[in-house]
């Protein structure tokens, strides 16, 4: 056992000792192997390989080839190289430009409207409907709103009840259901409304006429929930307890107090019916079989509001006057043509007031002006100085005091001791009507009693005694009360003007207000809608006794009704309620010194003027003329219409003119001038001073507005009551397709887009004569369907002053289109019932509206005739008038030259004759105050200011010069009809992303047209750069390239340009270059420029056209102004092969005569020349590039090498394609400096395609592809051929682009219309002999090719005839009949023919005055725009 163990240990020890020896042996073997391998490799390279090479080189080879083999090899190699170069290298342009253009994403029609479907559902919340209706008062602050609505009550009207609307009870609002409002038409009861008895069918609906007894009521309007039932004008009488007596011209406030229920009962017929004067003028009833709920604000709430918050009262009065002007007067004058109702206001105003100035005051000013006129030789109206050296101090008047008037007329030498020159005198002219002064002489002044300056005493008896017993014979004298004759005259004039305006010192609406405080603390109030009569108030002073108090009971409970109703079914009237008593809220009369201060302020604003005979002081259609008071003489009021002047009436001494113009800010409807045979002396209060004083003394607005209301006729107030003032936010829908046409709209401000669904409903005629939808054909639920741009068609737009929907109203049909507000807009809605009522009373209205509709339909028919050649076009861009009212200039990012751009655009708009104003934040704040955008209350004033500007100016430019988060930025976006999005063309970062202002534009979801204005430092566009801007901006509808310098500071702040490596390397090489080489290069450069100048002078007739600077007619801002103002000039060049070279001469002649071009379009060769002009906008490059192309196309060898087997065409098209590509390169149509389009014939879809985007060479080649000669160009699977097959002169498409004037150049072959008569059969041999027979009288019969060509151009011939008759077209046809289609080798000859023809034609047109007055062509424009930046006309070399 031990031996075994010891042996094992021995073996293990041996193994451990032998292991290191084995490891060393393996390592040595590896080293030896690697060494041996390296030796073998080195040996092979150093010994074996050289030996092999030497052996091979020492051998001899011999190859024998025949000549034919060598030639074949060379031909094969050459062919392979040619094919590789020809189809691999030389066609790279085709493969690069064949990539599909990124199509813009189709937008959802839901994006056009922000209106949610849930909002279309009628809300059952009374408060929501009430808040919607109370917006007619403008924005009301919290306390004011609470005071106005704290005593509001509701009344429910059942379906079988008729409501007698008494507007003196309060202001009512429909919060649930629909009310039908009727007006009494007693004057038509025996004629028009009974016409059906005579066999005439007037087609009244069942609900149009309501009979109560013998009285007939005609439907006036339907008031839906959320709309006021009361007239806004009626609120003027709710603020005061002194009710104005009813007059024949008064409307709306007819009380039921004089009418009993039995008299108004339907079963009361015959002679027992009440007199027509006692019957209510306005009644209402619920529509259909559903009840209606009214919310009523009692009149006491308005009186309390007037007492506590007089400033809020002035705001409501401002809203009333604003609506009166914007809605009622604009509609009545501009659309309905009832100008007499408006002009009668001022005539009646002067007829009611016959007072004149005292003779002792007027005589002095008359003598002074006549003496000044006789002594002065300078032309103009002498004006009296505003104030004399003596200051008038407004002091508190005592009962026994008077005025001490120093008469300047009495300080003459002829009256040295006249005692009457220093006596206290009255300013009233009617003193002698009540007083008798003995021993009156001619020279003595008229001594009168003062009635307008009576001080209110604390005692009523003292006040009465002062007003009655005040007499000049008992007055004392006071030196402190001394006046000069001038100050007394001014005060007397103010008093006379106040009398006209309805301002009286005794008016409680004036004297109960303290102008120094806008509000007072809230007094105690009675809560509860049942106590509308405020019977618990102890402070009621002198309540007015109501005539029907005995038959009325007080509203003691909530269940009693405010308005009286009559049950139609039971024919029993409800118990008459007692009319609430008028409340006079407590308060003392203000100090007379306040009113004296008011008159003194107005007196300071008066300007005395002498008007020469026949001189006009107010021009028709002018704004803010002010009020004129006639002191002496007379003024003629003249209305001009259709070039004829008509004298309406004469304003004599003591009258005023300019009343409505100054009062509500409307434009003057008449011209006012002095009589031809005599001069006039007037006192003038400028409009801006009047507005300033009215704002200061705001409590004067209420009596002025009440006086105006009393002057309006009943018909005017009826129209005002029924008209609706609609406010539509941007993106909201005004009317939907398929809705009943129950009225038409007149656009007051804003813009609407007309949209039509391509899958319309199917209307069927019903028995009643109305169109209804037949839903039985397709019962498909489309309520949740989203419509995309492919499902809708944009038909056009409606702008300021245009009317919408008359045709549907006249034909009693459904709406055919959908109207969407482009921006925040306002319309005046004329209900169908009101229109029918007015048509019965005034047939002239129907005649005028019929003419408007007929003119519109006639224009539409002419446009449809014009569009007939384009019935097959694939262009879906509608004709939309680009005469934008408001233009917003919005940058993409900050630090862009927005203000400089706006200044240049405004200057250009003025240069073309537009009345334009630019608005930025600073100018708006200057006019409206620093809180114009911060207070919600200022929104009314802001919108009113914008509306006034839209009425006064043709174009308003909103300059967005504020940060993104500014309120002014959002205001600019919301106010724009067209938004010009400014961008720096070199800003690559913004091009591929979205700017900060663009994000706000997207967020606001505006639907206004948005055009991208790319600003370039030079007239050069990098090929392909424009599409980068446009491909991701689906909200951009167009773009313009504008040359304008951007300051270096702005450039660095906008972007950090990347310096190309090549440019940097070139700069370094230039710095290190030899000075001698630099001088040599400069010398070569100078020679090159000199040669270019020579070439330009040769082309432009011996240097007549300057090469030194940009001509005025090529100014980019003038071009942009014409496009935005619908004054654009379009150039259309027709097709005709080589005859189109004459287009080059015509274009150069246009440049010579300074005729601007804004849009370019063409067909075939016209698309080529037009593309050159639109791309370069320069005649030098056009001439050189066109000549280069003509030389290439006319090359015999190029044509020969391009021939192919004529299966589709005789030529492959390669040489032709490359010739065009050599000219245009990779420039896209979007890169052209001018807006451009060309047409082609799509033989795949049988349509005419209009190309405005994409690679220019490809679509110009498509437009020039003659069938048989060249193969069609394929694009998106369609084959495109020459556009001349359908329209060889696309004038109609240019008209759709908005061009007002179109210069159309036709170079097509003459259509042979020789009569043919060869019988019913034709022999080919006879045709051949007929052509060879020189004595034959028969015309040559066309061959098969001629017939195919004529057949191909049938559509084009008809389109040409229509193009010649298009309005605004200047048709030119150079004498090029002697040249063939392929005579490109005669370039210079054909060019000269076109140039000489156009030059002579334009010269003759100018001399004879036939050339249209194109905006931007006049000498004045050249002078005004001559200060623009000047640079080289051409932008790159040929």
Curated annotation (Swiss-Prot):
Cytoplasmic side: 1-25, 86-1438
Example of a GO MF term: lysophospholipase activity
Composition-biased stretches (Polar residues): 432-450
GO biological process, one term: lipid catabolic process
Chain segments annotated as transmembrane: 26-46, 65-85
The family this protein is said to belong to: Belongs to the NTE family.
Name of protein: Lysophospholipase NTE1
Entries under InterPro entries matching the protein: Acyl_Trfase/lysoPLipase, cNMP-bd_dom, cNMP-bd_dom_sf, NTE, NTE1_P-loop_dom, PNPLA_dom, RmlC-like_jellyroll
SUPFAM superfamilies on file: cAMP-binding domain-like, FabD/lysophospholipase-like
UniProt: a nucleoside 3',5'-cyclic phosphate 2 binding residues: 707-856
CDD domains with a match to the protein in the record: CAP_ED
UniProt: a nucleoside 3',5'-cyclic phosphate 1 binding residues: 590-720
């Amino acid at each position: 056992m031990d031996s075994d163990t010891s042996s094992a240990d021995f073996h293990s020890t041996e193994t451990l000792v032998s292991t290191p020896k084995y490891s060393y042996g393996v390592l040595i073997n590896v080293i030896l192997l690697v060494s041996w391998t390296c030796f073998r490799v080195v040996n092979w390279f150093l010994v074996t390989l050289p030996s092999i090479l030497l052996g091979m080189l020492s051998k001899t080879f011999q190859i024998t080839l025949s000549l034919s083999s060598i030639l074949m090899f060379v031909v094969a190699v050459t062919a392979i190289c040619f094919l590789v170069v020809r189809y691999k290298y030389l066609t790279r342009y085709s493969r690069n430009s064949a990539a599909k253009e990124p199509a813009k994403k189709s937008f959802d029609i839901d994006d056009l409207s922000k209106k949610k479907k849930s909002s279309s559902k009628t809300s059952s919340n009374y408060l929501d409907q009430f808040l919607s209706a109370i917006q007619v008062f403008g924005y009301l602050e919290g306390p004011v709103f609470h005071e106005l609505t704290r005593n509001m009550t509701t009344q429910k009207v059942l379906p079988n009840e008729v409501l007698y609307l008494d507007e003196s009870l309060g202001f009512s609002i429909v919060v649930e259901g629909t009310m039908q409002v009727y007006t009494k038409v007693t004057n038509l009861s025996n004629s028009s409304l009974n016409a059906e008895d005579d066999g005439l069918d007037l087609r009244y609906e069942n609900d149009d006429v309501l009979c109560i007894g013998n009285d007939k009521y005609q439907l006036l309007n339907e008031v839906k929930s959320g709309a006021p039932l009361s007239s806004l004008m009626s609120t003027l009488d709710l603020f005061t307890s002194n009710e104005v007596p009813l007059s024949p011209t008064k409307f709306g406030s007819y009380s039921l107090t004089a009418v009993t229920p039995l008299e108004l009962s339907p079963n009361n017929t015959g002679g027992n019916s009440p007199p027509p004067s006692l019957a209510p003028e306005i009644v209402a009833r619920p529509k259909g079989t559903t009840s209606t709920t009214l919310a009523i604000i009692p009149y006491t709430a308005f009186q309390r509001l007037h007492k506590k918050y007089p400033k809020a009262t002035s705001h409501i009065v401002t809203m009333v006057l604003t609506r009166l002007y914007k809605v009622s007067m604009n509609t009545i004058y501009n659309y309905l043509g009832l100008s007499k109702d408006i002009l009668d206001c001022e005539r009646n105003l002067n007829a009611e007031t016959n007072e004149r100035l005292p003779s002792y005051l007027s005589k002095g000013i008359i003598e002074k002006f006549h003496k000044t006129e006789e002594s002065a030789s300078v032309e103009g109206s002498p004006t009296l100085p505003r104030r004399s050296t003596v200051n008038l101090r407004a002091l508190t008047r005592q009962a026994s005091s008077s005025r001490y008037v120093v008469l300047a007329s009495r300080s003459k030498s002829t009256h040295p001791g006249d005692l009457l020159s220093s006596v206290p005198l009255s300013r009233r002219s009617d003193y002698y009507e009540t007083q008798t002064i003995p021993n009156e002489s001619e020279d003595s002044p008229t001594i009168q009693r003062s009635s307008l300056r009576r001080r209110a005493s604390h005692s009523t008896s003292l006040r009465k005694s002062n007003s009655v017993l005040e007499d000049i014979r008992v007055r004392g004298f006071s030196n402190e009360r001394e006046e000069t004759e001038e100050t007394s005259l001014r005060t007397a004039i103010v008093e006379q003007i106040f009398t006209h305006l309805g301002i009286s010192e005794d008016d409680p609406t004036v004297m109960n207000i303290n102008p120094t405080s806008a509000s007072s603390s809230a007094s105690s109030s009675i809560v509860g809608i049942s106590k509308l009569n405020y019977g618990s108030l102890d402070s009621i002073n002198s309540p007015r006794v109501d005539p029907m108090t005995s038959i009325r009971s007080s509203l003691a409970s909530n269940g009693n009704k405010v308005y009286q109703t009559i049950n139609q079914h039971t024919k029993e009237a409800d118990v008459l309620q007692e009319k609430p008593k008028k409340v006079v809220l407590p308060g003392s009369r203000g100090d007379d010194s306040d009113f004296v201060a008011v008159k003194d302020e107005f007196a300071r604003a008066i300007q005395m003027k002498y008007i020469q005979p026949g001189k006009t002081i107010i021009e028709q259609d002018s704004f803010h003329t002010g009020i004129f008071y006639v002191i002496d003489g007379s003024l003629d009021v003249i209305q001009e219409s259709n070039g004829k002047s008509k004298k309406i009436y004469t304003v004599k001494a003591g009258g005023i003119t300019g009343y409505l113009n100054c009062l509500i800010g409307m434009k003057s409807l008449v011209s006012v001038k002095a009589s031809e045979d005599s001069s006039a002396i007037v006192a003038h209060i400028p409009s801006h001073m009047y507005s300033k004083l009215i704002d200061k003394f705001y409590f004067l607005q209420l009596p002025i507005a009440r006086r105006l209301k009393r002057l309006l006729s009943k018909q005017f107030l009826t129209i005002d009551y029924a008209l609706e003032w609609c406010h539509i936010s941007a993106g909201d829908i005004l009317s939907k397709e398929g809705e009943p046409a129950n009225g038409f709209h007149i656009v007051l401000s804003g813009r609407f887009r007309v949209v039509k669904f391509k899958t319309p409903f199917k209307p069927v005629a019903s028995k009643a004569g109305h169109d209804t939808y037949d839903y039985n054909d397709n019962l498909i639920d489309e309520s949740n369907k989203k419509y995309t741009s492919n499902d809708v068609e944009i038909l056009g737009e409606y702008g300021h002053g245009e009317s919408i929907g008359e045709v549907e109203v006249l034909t009693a049909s459904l709406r055919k289109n959908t109207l969407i507000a482009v921006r925040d807009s306002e319309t005046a809605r004329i209900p169908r019932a009101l229109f029918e009522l007015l048509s019965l009373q005034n047939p002239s209205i129907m005649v005028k509206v019929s003419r408007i509709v007929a003119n519109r339909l006639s224009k539409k028919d002419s446009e449809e005739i014009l569009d007939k050649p384009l019935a097959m076009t694939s262009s879906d861009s509608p004709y939309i008038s680009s005469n934008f009212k408001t233009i917003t200039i919005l940058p993409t990012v900050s630090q862009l030259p927005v203000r400089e751009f706006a200044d240049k655009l405004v200057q250009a708009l003025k240069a073309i004759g537009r009345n334009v104003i630019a608005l930025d934040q600073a100018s708006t704040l200057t006019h409206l105050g620093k809180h114009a955008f911060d207070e919600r209350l200022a929104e009314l004033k802001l919108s009113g200011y914008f509306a006034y500007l839209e009425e006064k100016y043709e174009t308003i430019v909103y300059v967005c010069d504020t940060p993104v988060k500014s309120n002014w930025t959002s205001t600019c976006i919301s106010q724009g009809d067209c938004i010009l999005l400014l961008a720096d063309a070199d800003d690559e970062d913004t091009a591929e992303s979205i700017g900060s202002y663009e994000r706000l534009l997207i967020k606001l979801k505006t639907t206004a047209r948005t055009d991208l204005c790319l600003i370039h430092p030079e007239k050069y566009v990098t090929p392909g750069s424009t599409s980068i801007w446009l491909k991701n901006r689906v909200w951009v509808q167009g773009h313009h390239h504008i040359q304008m310098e951007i300051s270096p500071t702005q450039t660095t702040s906008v972007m950090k340009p990347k310096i190309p490596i090549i440019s940097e390397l070139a700069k370094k090489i230039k710095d290190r270059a030899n000075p001698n080489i630099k001088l040599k290069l400069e010398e070569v450069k100078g020679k090159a420029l000199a040669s270019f100048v020579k070439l330009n002078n040769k082309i432009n007739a011996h240097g007549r056209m300057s090469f030194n600077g940009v001509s005025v007619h090529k100014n980019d801002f003038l071009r942009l102004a014409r496009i935005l103002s619908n004054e654009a000039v379009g150039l259309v060049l027709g097709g005709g092969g080589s005859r189109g070279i004459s287009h080059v001469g015509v274009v150069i002649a246009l440049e010579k005569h300074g005729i601007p071009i804004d849009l370019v379009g063409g067909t075939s060769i016209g698309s080529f020349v037009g593309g050159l002009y639109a791309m370069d906008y320069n005649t030098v490059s056009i001439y050189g590039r066109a000549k280069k192309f003509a030389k290439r196309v006319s090359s015999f060898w190029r044509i020969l090498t391009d021939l192919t087997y004529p299966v589709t065409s005789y030529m492959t098209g390669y040489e032709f394609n490359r010739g065009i590509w050599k000219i245009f390169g990779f420039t896209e149509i979007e890169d052209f400096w001018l807006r451009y389009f060309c047409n082609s014939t799509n033989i795949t879809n049988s349509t005419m395609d209009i190309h405005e985007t994409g690679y220019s060479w490809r679509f110009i080649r498509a437009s020039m592809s003659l069938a048989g000669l060249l193969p069609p160009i394929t694009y998106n699977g369609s084959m495109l051929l020459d556009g001349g097959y359908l329209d060889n002169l696309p004038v109609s498409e240019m008209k759709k682009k908005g061009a007002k004037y179109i210069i159309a150049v036709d170079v097509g072959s003459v259509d042979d219309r020789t009569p043919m008569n060869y019988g019913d059969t034709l022999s080919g041999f006879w045709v051949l002999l007929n052509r060879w027979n020189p004595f034959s009288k028969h015309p040559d019969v066309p061959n098969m090719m001629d017939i195919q060509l004529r057949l191909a151009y049938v559509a084009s011939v008809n389109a040409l005839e229509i193009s010649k008759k298009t309005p605004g077209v200047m048709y030119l046809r150079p004498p090029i009949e002697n040249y063939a289609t392929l005579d490109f080798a005669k370039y210079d000859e054909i060019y000269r023919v076109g140039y000489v023809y156009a030059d002579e034609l334009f010269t003759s047109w100018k001399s004879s005055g036939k050339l249209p007055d194109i905006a931007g062509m006049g000498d004045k424009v050249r002078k005004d725009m001559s200060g623009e930046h000047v640079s080289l006309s051409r932008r790159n070399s040929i």
